[in-house]
């Protein structure tokens, strides 16, 4: 789909591809198809293999591709030749020219597999007039409060929220988060790969969002 001149494609599970001003970047690519192009930037949220997939980083990267990741991914990503890996943490901000990226908190309070002390990440990315919030593997957390203002501004504000209950926030919690953040558009993620989350979870998220006056849409995997 196109959002204010930014092309957004679903890579499956929790992965997305953004194309803007002739540049491509991917977030958490996992089991991507052969149709996905090489990218200039890859953002990794944390070290679990369905988010930090070495095979997919190798598949999408080219010489000089920048890979942002938290410290727990560092040793695994050293296996990928030719990339420029940058270890980042919450609060870091990187300006790529075509996109400005900020690292934000992502953790679960209901599941110890994503503990806050791990320092794992979500990302805010601004491209043109649009701010994209990629929540990562998270529950609703207090740190999301500072994002509530984005939905009240003139800028487009698009949020990507997990809908896989038991591991991260479930559908109802994701709808509650979307209501709090008041985005221009809410897009479900973390489903359909067989790891956790189903297409029905994503469909239910969209249905419940619309019942609550929230614009939401599923994307088709490329």
Indicate residue ranges for each PLM-predicted region.
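Core dinuclear metal-dependent hydrolase active-site scaffold
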Residues: 1-37, 87-154, 220-222
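Metallo-beta-lactamase
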Residues: 125-184, 189-197
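Active-site environment of divalent metal-dependent phosphoester hydrolases
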Residues: 33-34, 48-52, 74-77, 92-95, ...
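Binuclear metal-ion centers of metallo-dependent hydrolases, dominated by the metallo-beta-lactamase
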Residues: 81-96, 175, 179-222
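Short, Asp-centered acidic motifs that coordinate Mg2+ and/or phosphate
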Residues: 24-25, 41, 158, 185
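Active-site metal-binding motif and surrounding structural segment of the metallo-beta-lactamase
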Residues: 30-76, 150-160
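A short acidic, amphipathic alpha-helical/loop segment
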Residues: 55-60, 76-81, 143-147, 173-177
């Amino acid at each position: 789909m196109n959002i204010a001149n930014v092309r957004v494609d679903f890579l499956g599970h929790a992965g997305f591809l953004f194309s803007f001003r002739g540049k491509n970047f991917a977030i958490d690519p996992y089991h991507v198809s052969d149709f996905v192009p090489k990218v200039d930037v890859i953002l990794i949220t944390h070290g679990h293999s369905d988010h930090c997939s070495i095979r997919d980083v190798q598949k999408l990267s080219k010489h000089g591709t920048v890979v942002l990741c938290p410290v727990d991914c560092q040793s695994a990503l050293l296996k990928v030749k030719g990339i420029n890996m940058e270890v980042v943490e919450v609060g870091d901000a990187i300006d790529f020219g075509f996109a400005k990226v900020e690292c934000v908190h992502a953790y679960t309070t209901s599941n110890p597999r994503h503990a806050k002390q791990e320092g794992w990440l979500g990302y805010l990315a601004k491209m043109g007039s649009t701010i994209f919030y990629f929540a990562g593997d998270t529950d609703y957390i207090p740190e999301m409060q500072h994002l509530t203002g984005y939905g009240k501004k003139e800028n487009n504000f698009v949020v990507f929220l997990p809908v896989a209950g038991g591991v991260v926030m479930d559908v109802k919690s994701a709808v509650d988060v979307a209501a709090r953040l008041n985005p221009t558009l809410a897009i479900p993620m973390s489903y359909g790969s067989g790891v956790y989350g189903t297409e029905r979870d994503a469909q239910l998220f969209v249905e419940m969002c619309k019942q609550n006056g929230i614009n939401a849409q599923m994307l088709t995997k490329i």
